Amino acid sequence: DVGLRYVGFKDIGLPFDRLKALAEVIHECGQEVMLEVVSEDKRDELRSAQASLDLGVDYLLGGSHAEEITEILAGSGIRYCPFPGRVVGHPSQLRGGIEEITESARRLAAMEGVSGLDLLAYRYDGDVSALVRSVVGAVDVPVIVAGSMNSEERIRSLADAGVWGFTVGSAIFDGRFARGASLREQVQAVLAASRTVAS
């Protein structure tokens, strides 16, 4: 009842039956469910894609094996948003030059079964603003920014660049948007910041 339209969670940390129950509760509340892939190898990533089908989520965010994942998701209605660029390590880091990442974004966006992109912009060690503008300007699919979203300034920068959305996780649990506030108040602070920059 705070105005969230999308709620996401990672594919690790809870047993499958608890993830399934969580997805069902989110849907019952009228929100769409986003599953974030947290995998360090191809096998785990493909397992996460299969889990997205079994969980009944609406979006699958992340992953670097788009050809295989689009085959798994074909006909499911799940909107898949892979990572453009070269993603390494855990927590994930985005590597490569802006042109290389932008070309990866173009290639992915043109693939059948890809509905958007999940850009690890703040996990990039170069010019983040230039990267985001380059990727958003190069594709005709929604661009979601994930990772290290921890300030109103970053929300404003992404809005100015024209991203479709962003994910926030740890910053809410760490109280980065409203010091000493409840989880609900943290979410409300992020939504308020988003509305302010969108108007």
PLM feature segments, named:
Residues I12-G13, V38-E40, P84-V88, S148-M149, ...:
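Short, acidic/turn-prone active-site loops that include or flank metal/cofactor-
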Residues C29-G30, S76, V139:
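Helix C-cap/helix->beta junction micro-motif
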Residues D1-V33, S39-R43, A51-G56, R106-G113, ...:
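Conserved N-terminal beta1-alpha1 strand-loop-helix module at the mouth
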